[in-house]
């Protein structure tokens, strides 16, 4: 595949006017059949973007644009125009299916060029928008642009969107209704990664039940470092059955909670032929009973599991179940459990609270208030129509 790259050269391109500057792009100028252009790791000003735009627009065979980290050191007023020029050129590339714009400090100021491009570029299949500082308002507008893209794709019978990588963008709960609509409108997605976006339980619930549960061809889902608690975990437990092709599930640092993790593991236990290859569950307050159930699920229903991450949870690396999980992998001749070197220990106060709760519940013949609340929540979630 013909590829042009100046990756990582740390060039400060304010304008491309001298012969030395143009010589850097000589190969690009000569190759009309180039399929991939990599500009990452350089800083591009407005006039340089104008020159590049004029020359990129003619590359009708271009398939991949790697434009991550191309505005370091640029003032916020300069970035929108430079971005607009580059994206206008990409709109003229009919085979361009992969666009990487990560690690650019767009913030809210550069949202308009993005919105215009994302709503119009129907060949798009793989979008990388990671660490762009969007915030919830700009994030919601980006989501609406992708909804418009779905309409335009359908009108042109264009290939479906397959990947959305949009992490570290402070999307928060405020944009989740729009993102849920986006996932409803792009139901053939294979990969969704929305890590570290400050999404809290109510937003997670909406995202899962009103959005991602509709994406039944999903293979990779990564929501690490958002906050689930029992509410979000219960929604995940419902949604799991919607993804029969899921191969990777990333839930590290999601605060599933003991009850939430138990609900997720219980949901796994009710599925058949689980094709997961990677399951990341670090730092989620998972307790021993849930791990025991998970071991049984892995043994009986996850024959393809290769990577399991459980560090930072509420059980000991000395517990028998840890050796039992490793024995399952050893017997198969494949599979790996991460190092359990940072396990969380319950404080004396937490242990006393749990003992008191258990003692107070055990003699009660009637349903406790907590159980009533759990049942009401389960009933409410079960009404969600997918």
Swiss-Prot record:
What Gene Ontology terms describe where this protein resides (cellular component)? cytoplasm; cytosol; nuclear periphery; nucleus; perinuclear region of cytoplasm
Its protein name is Ran GTPase-activating protein 1
Question: Organism, per UniProt?
Answer: Schizosaccharomyces pombe (strain 972 / ATCC 24843) (Fission yeast)
Which residue intervals are annotated with compositional bias (Basic and acidic residues) in the record?
Answer: 374-386
Site, as annotated: Critical residue for GTP hydrolysis: 74
Gene3D superfamilies according to UniProt: Ribonuclease Inhibitor
CDD domains found in the cross-reference section? LRR_RI
Complexes and interactors: Monomer.
Molecular function GO labels: GTPase activator activity; small GTPase binding
Q: What does this protein do?
A: GTPase activator for the nuclear Ras-related regulatory protein spi1 (Ran), converting it to the putatively inactive GDP-bound state.
Q: Where is the composition biased (Acidic residues)?
A: 338-359
Gene (name only): rna1
Is Repressor one of the keywords? Answer: no
Q: Which family does it belong to?
A: Belongs to the RNA1 family.
GO biological process assignments: nuclear export; protein export from nucleus
Subcellular localization is given as: Cytoplasm; Cytoplasm, Perinuclear region
Q: Which SUPFAM superfamilies match?
A: RNI-like (SSF52047)
Q: Where is this region: Disordered?
A: 333-386
Keywords (A to Z) from UniProt? Cytoplasm, GTPase activation, Leucine-rich repeat, Repeat
Instruction: Give residue ranges of the LRR repeats.
Output: 23-48, 85-112, 113-141, 179-206, 207-235, 236-264, 265-293, 294-322
